[in-house]
Swiss-Prot record:
Coiled coil: none
GO biological process per UniProt: (+)-epi-alpha-bisabolol biosynthetic process; diterpenoid biosynthetic process; farnesyl diphosphate catabolic process
EC annotation from Swiss-Prot or TrEMBL: 4.2.3.138
GO MF annotations in UniProt: magnesium ion binding; sesquiterpene synthase activity
Keyword presence, Magnesium: yes
Physiological role: Sesquiterpene synthase involved in the biosynthesis of (+)-epi-alpha-bisabolol, a precursor of the natural sweetner hernandulcin.
Record's cofactor remark: Binds 3 Mg(2+) ions per subunit.
Placement of sequence motif DDXXD motif: 297-301
UniProt source species: Phyla dulcis
Family matches, as InterPro entries: Isoprenoid_synthase_dom_sf (IPR008949), Terpene_cyclase-like_1_C (IPR034741), Terpene_cyclase_plant_C1 (IPR044814), Terpene_synth_N (IPR001906), Terpene_synth_N_sf (IPR036965), Terpene_synthase-like (IPR050148), Terpene_synthase_metal-bd (IPR005630), Terpenoid_cyclase/PrenylTrfase (IPR008930)
Superkingdom of the source species: Eukaryota
Catalytic activity: (2E,6E)-farnesyl diphosphate + H2O = (+)-epi-alpha-bisabolol + diphosphate
Protein name, per record: (+)-epi-alpha-bisabolol synthase
UniProt: Mg(2+) 3 binding residues: 441, 445, 449
Length: 546
């Protein structure tokens, strides 16, 4: 065993050890702050009910979502969006029909909530040649709203393609002009990543700061947003402490020191998928799974021999501890930690929902390991897959189907065996999100992974397929991400076979990947830099209150 030649990825150690995580403390879980938040929510409800103009309503909905407090006011939001939808569809008189901002904001919010609204509502802003009118260039607020709305497009919607190109071009031009700093910051933030591609909770510190600088800022909404953020942060800290205690008991960080120790970064994935308080179980499940996936991925990618990997894959596929004796010691530790964690979590699930998820959970772990083994065989044989062949495996090895199928189990009240089995085919609701996660991951990690000697990723596969250079290929992959979002908008957002909670979580999976790998770096694997800033902002540092 000791004489076996093994590769090393030289991963940096975690900067979030158990001692530090257990020391996290927040006063915002105290009863006085919870009572204050309830009082503020009642005052906001009164404010919302006093609002009469449809445009004021949709702007309030937008603000509530950006400030990540919309989950407190779902009844109000649902009622008012239905009213706006009825106005647009029935052709009833609306005083804002010529208002680009009002029309595009309504379109975006309605589509975001699953309403099927035609892009024809934008015809009023186009000339006889089918182009957007040039006089719209000076309407910066309208341009920003048009830009954000254009990312709700689906395949074949040429009006929306034109809207996106038009708005992007003119917003970039506006940035070069001498303009108000707050407005310039808002444009730059939008051009960096559109709102539809962001998770509101992961972006909320920026949104709160931006809202506070607005001239039309409502102090009541701002106060609630800050307090709600701090209360949620207190809850997230408690969850991380619980996760850290679990992780310490597994002894995986010290026993498998060659692998990534990324508990906190894994928790960010769970937080991004489902940030609301009532989705705690989902967050914890995703965090535990992602932590274990990172370790197992490193076993297959870097440390394990091909013979060992075949034995480990077989043990996971059989889901039986009698195969433990066949494994080397480091794999025994990993397999038993996986086996116990999944079974304990499934026991809690059985008590809560009366449903045995072990067969479905173990299936996804086996599927993941079998795919890792295929990719390991590619590496050891020197095989170079085409981009399509790579993505067919890569959508599984990035663990999208694993995370989304478990999220479905958590978010579905009345579980049916048939529906869960249907998910095993990785239908579009899972496929497109997983492909997007794979592409975003590869943009951020492929350079470092190739230095370690890992398999070629999507960038290298496309370069090998086409002869393009890396810069051209990165541009191609970014365009592929855009076209994949069109599929997500149709096959996930508008797929009414699934609950809105699950559809939102699925899209959040795509969004978190772009958050983690936003700057073409590895926000999951590299603990310093942007990753550290994000953890501090979301989980460690509260927003100062007066």
């Amino acid at each position: 065993m000791n004489s076996t030649s093994r590769r090393s990825a030289n991963y940096k150690p975690t900067i979030w050890n158990n001692e530090y995580l257990q020391s996290l403390n927040s006063i915002y879980g105290e009863k006085r702050f919870l009572e204050q938040a309830e009082k503020l929510k009642d005052e906001v409800r009164m404010l919302l009910e006093k609002t009469s103009d449809p445009l004021d309503h949709i702007e309030l909905v937008d603000v509530l979502q950006r400030l990540a407090i919309s989950y407190h006011f779902t009844e109000y939001i649902d009622r008012n969006l239905k009213n706006i939808y009825d106005i647009l569809i029935d052709g009833r008189r609306w005083n804002h029909a010529d208002n680009l901002h009002a029309t595009t904001l309504s379109f975006r919010l309605l589509r975001q909530h699953g309403y099927q609204v035609s892009p024809e509502v934008f015809r009023n802003f186009m000339d006889e040649t089918g182009n957007f009118k040039k006089n719209l260039c000076d309407d910066i607020k309208g341009l920003l709203s048009l830009y954000e709305a254009s990312y709700l497009l689906t395949e074949g919607e040429t009006i929306m393609d034109s809207a996106q190109a038009f708005a992007t071009h003119h917003l970039k031009q506006k940035l070069e002009e001498n303009m108000n700093k707050n407005l310039g910051d808002e444009i730059a933030h939008a051009l960096e990543l559109p709102l539809h591609w962001r998770v509101p909770k992961l972006d909320v510190r920026w949104s709160i700061d931006a809202y506070e600088r607005r001239q039309d800022m409502n102090p009541l909404l701002l106060e609630l947003a800050k307090l709600d953020f701090n209360i949620a942060q207190s809850m997230y800290q408690d969850e991380l402490k619980e996760l850290s205690r679990w992780y310490s008991k597994t002894h995986l960080p010290e026993k498998l020191a060659f692998a990534r120790d990324r508990l906190v970064e894994s928790y960010l994935w769970g937080l991004g998928l489902a940030s609301e308080p009532h989705h705690k179980y989902c967050r914890m499940m995703v965090a535990q799974s992602t932590t274990l996936i990172s370790i197992i991925d490193d076993i297959y990618d870097v440390y394990g021999t091909l013979d060992e990997l075949q034995l480990f894959t077989h043990a996971v596929d059989r889901w039986d501890i009698k195969y433990l004796e066949q494994l080397p010691e480091y794999m025994q530790i990993c397999f038993l930690a996986l086996f116990n964690t999944v079974n304990e979590r499934s026991y809690d699930f059985l008590l809560d929902k009366g449903f045995n998820v072990i067969p479905h959970s173990s299936y996804r772990w086996a599927e993941l390991c079998k795919t890792y083994l295929i990719e390991a065989n590619w590496y050891h044989s020197g095989y170079k897959p085409s981009l399509n062949e790579y993505l067919n495996q890569g959508l599984i090895s990035v663990a999208g189907p694993h995370a989304l199928s478990h999220t479905y189990l958590c978010m579905t009240d009345s579980l049916k065996e048939k529906h869960i089995l249907d998910l095993r085919t990785n239908p579009p609701v899972i496929k497109w999100v997983s492909i997007l996660v794979r592409l975003a991951d590869d943009l951020g990690t492929s350079t470092d992974e190739l230095k370690r000697g890992d398999n070629p990723k999507s960038i290298q596969c496309h370069m090998h397929d086409t002869g393009c250079n890396e810069e051209e290929t990165r541009a191609y992959i970014k365009n592929l991400i855009g076209s994949t979002w069109k599929k997500i908008n149709k096959d996930v957002l508008m797929n009414f076979e699934y609950s809105m909670d699950f559809r939102t979580a699925a899209m959040n999976g795509a969004r978190v990947s772009q958050f983690m790998y936003q700057y073409d770096d590895d926000g999951h694997g590299v603990p310093e830099g942007k990753s550290k800033e994000r953890v501090c902002s979301l989980i460690v540092e509260p927003i100062p209150l007066p």
